Amino acid sequence: LLLCGLPAQAALPDTVDKIRPSIVAVGTVKPAKRANAAGPALNYLGTGFVVGSGRQVITNFHVIPEKLDAEAMEALAVFVGRGGSGEARQARVVRSDPDHDVALLEIGGAALPALQLAESGTVREGEEIAFTGYPIGPVLGLYPATHRGIVSAVTPIVIPAMSSRTLTAEQVRRIRSPFDVYQLDATAYPGNSGSPVYNVQSGRVVGVINSVLVKKTKEAALADPSGITYAIPVRYVRALLDGAR
């Protein structure tokens, strides 16, 4: 029995080695001469991962700032590399899906290794997964961290309340257009938003880490939202990429 468990255990370090070059940070950048008076030159907002052509990046829609400081020449950027050797590449939003909180960015420069996407609808409860990203990016910097767990449940993004009087406007909207999300037993932190959730053995992406969208609906009634982590299924990433072709 112990021997049967070894291949899966040994697979994660090898998988992480393949995944890591495709993980990027998403944020904003300002020219150094403008940064002092208008905040930091670099601002990490979340995580993204490279797909498709190697110049396409998937992240959460909520990671993208609603507006940029034009006076300070602030620009949307993707940060590649590791630690002090990282570089900023200017990015632009190609397509977005606010309803499922995913966005597709395009970056310049040399193509990066792209992650493969799993087929939609193949995730099973109990499946071993991992996700890699930049938790607390502004503090910990460009050092990607990996967390491991399982898919605990495939669950609706919102569950109807006992009384309609307790429903928020966001919950009502979600009840009218429901979809399932993945509940994970691994903990994500601020900065992990947009991280790819992938199968431990194959490395194929099955979802995108998201807490903001789900907690507005599924846990809206809780005074202290739980530490449960959720992920948006990869089918919505596929739809975004298909629409960009």
Identify the meaning behind each predicted range.
Residues 14-15, 92-94, 108-143:
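Active-site substrate-binding loop(s) of clan PA
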Residues 22-35, 39-41, 106-116, 144-242:
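Active-site region of chymotrypsin-like
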Residues 72-77, 82-91, 125-130, 144-165:
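Beta-strand/loop subdomains of soluble extracytoplasmic proteins
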